[in-house]
Amino acid sequence: AEPVAGRLPVILSTRRLDVVGAVDGLSGQITAGAGATLGDVRRAAQAAGWYYGVDLAARDSATIGGTVATNAGGIHVVAYGMTRAQLVGIEAVLPDGRVVSHLAGMLKDNTGYDFGALLCGSEGTLGVITAVRLRLHRPAGRTSVALVGCETYEQAIGLMSSGVASGARLIAAEVIDETGMELAGRLHGLPWPLRNRHPVVTLLEVADGGDASGFSGIDDLDVVVGLDASEQARLWLYREAQGEAFSALGVTHKLDVSVPLPVLAQC
């Protein structure tokens, strides 16, 4: 809630709107209340043999309504896109109290405005999201994860293309600087994962059957590869612990900034 001068702020919780519907196997969709957590939706999809494309480290506290209101990206944007790409229907209460409901999940629908696209990313300025209809995906299968030491951001970003073999599907690509790697490791008692220290470390995850065949041209680099689930979770922890690791230092100022890759490569 945003306080207005001379008025008491109002805080509205959607936590009790937490029902997750059954997966519609015919359309590959699921309906969920705004208060359901991202983890709830992902587990419901997985139990039915499907996969929800948005994932965050805060999956068990982030609500679906919140991820839609902010158009959350998460760690699999390169494979599945932002939250807006998953949204096929929405229900919301407008400022005047009217309820807008489009939860049928029809992909071929040109009847007027795309309210989902308008409300997604609006952060509550256009209405309060109460339920959503989401697109699901078939699981990518077994994957391989690699941490690769890099000397520049240009090299790190280049690996997102040159480091992936033809025919393999890139599932995730993350770039972490040396400070972030060190802090995450210190927080969880993990050693530096590579032979040498590097200013930048790139995390790549590819769908390749889980045998590392999806990587290309990284054998001569400083690299560690995880094939089993426990080793992959350990490598991912260096990325997923970033927020917690920096917060442990004291008051932090966090910004979610998007820049074109060529610009980032110049850093």
Where are these regions (language model features)?
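Short, acidic (Asp/Glu-rich) active-site segment that either coordinates a divalent metal cofactor
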Residues: 1-4, 10-13, 125-133, 206-215, ...
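Glycine-rich N-terminal segment of FAD-binding domains in flavoprotein oxidoreductases
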Residues: 1-17, 32, 52-54
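Short glycine-enriched loops at secondary-structure junctions
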Residues: 15-17, 126, 179, 230
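Short, hinge-like loop/turn segments at secondary-structure boundaries
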Residues: 7-11, 71-72, 190-191
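Short secondary-structure boundary/hinge segments and terminal tails
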Residues: 1, 62-64, 181
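FAD-binding subdomain of flavoenzyme oxidoreductases
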Residues: 19-23, 28-175
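A generic structural signal for beta-strand entry/edge sites
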Residues: 9, 27-31, 201
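C-terminal substrate-recognition/cap domain of FAD-linked oxidoreductases
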Residues: 137-138, 144-267
